[in-house]
């Protein structure tokens, strides 16, 4: 059995991950972690998320290192916020616990800190801004279209999410922009345009527009537009429920347990893309 720990265990994503892990024949949840000094600490995890008693107590993250050393999970799954995720990965690395990270909003410096901890302690990590299988196929298609069309088409990326999402643009939109830039041999830091306002003038050559919409309960919509003279190609992915991301997490855990042969992998590795 693969022993799984989950951060943000009482939240929307955390609870869905736990319920799905518990439904697998080869996995079990052995730890649930909430924010430091959480009032939920000590509660039975299963009862908290509506599964019934599991015999696993929720812990506050201030006790993470101690509990990891005691419980010894095989992997910790993190869908929280960037700052917390970095500290969690560092602690997991010190304790020899592998990680699957779907947290978004991580900047380059935070990713560098994560990568160093993972490599220095020789653990395995699957890190992706979007774990959904369909989104990663979407990434692959976006890259192929960019490569075929070249620099003659203007590229605009539009993402939409629920009004509670904290970071913008989404990690998925940023990754799509990176893929476009890589395939067009562009420096994204120079060519990215995050929204427009006022008299911005003519669109600069090779600019990559990135736009964020927030409203209601939108789970996640992403559109990459390749706009040419007289025609437009749109590559679209829409997530209707968070289960799409959870299913990807299960794939990542299984891949890490049986096939992963390097310290840091992403969902392209998991899916063989």
Swiss-Prot record:
Keywords: Amino-acid biosynthesis, Cytoplasm, Diaminopimelate biosynthesis, Lysine biosynthesis, NAD, NADP, Oxidoreductase. (S)-2,3,4,5-tetrahydrodipicolinate binds at residues 162, 171-172. It comes from the Archaea. GO terms for biological process: diaminopimelate biosynthetic process; lysine biosynthetic process via diaminopimelate. It catalyses: (S)-2,3,4,5-tetrahydrodipicolinate + NAD(+) + H2O = (2S,4S)-4-hydroxy-2,3,4,5-tetrahydrodipicolinate + NADH + H(+); (S)-2,3,4,5-tetrahydrodipicolinate + NADP(+) + H2O = (2S,4S)-4-hydroxy-2,3,4,5-tetrahydrodipicolinate + NADPH + H(+). Its EC number is 1.17.1.8. The active site is at residues 161, 165. Pfam families: DapB_C, DapB_N. CDD domains: DHDPR_N. It is an enzyme of class 1 (oxidoreductase). NAD(+) binds at residues 8-13, 34, 102-104, 128-131. Pathway: Amino-acid biosynthesis; L-lysine biosynthesis via DAP pathway; (S)-tetrahydrodipicolinate from L-aspartate: step 4/4. InterPro entries: DapB_C (IPR022663), DapB_N (IPR000846), DapB_N_CS (IPR022664), DHDPR_bac (IPR023940), NAD(P)-bd_dom_sf (IPR036291). It is found in: Cytoplasm. One of its GO terms (molecular function) is oxidoreductase activity, acting on CH or CH2 groups, NAD or NADP as acceptor. One of its GO terms (cellular component) is cytoplasm. HAMAP family: DapB. Belongs to the DapB family. Catalyzes the conversion of 4-hydroxy-tetrahydrodipicolinate (HTPA) to tetrahydrodipicolinate. NCBIfam families: dapB. PANTHER family: 4-HYDROXY-TETRAHYDRODIPICOLINATE REDUCTASE 1, CHLOROPLASTIC-RELATED, DIHYDRODIPICOLINATE REDUCTASE. This is 4-hydroxy-tetrahydrodipicolinate reductase. The lineage of its organism: Archaea, Methanobacteriati, Methanobacteriota, Methanomada group, Methanobacteria.
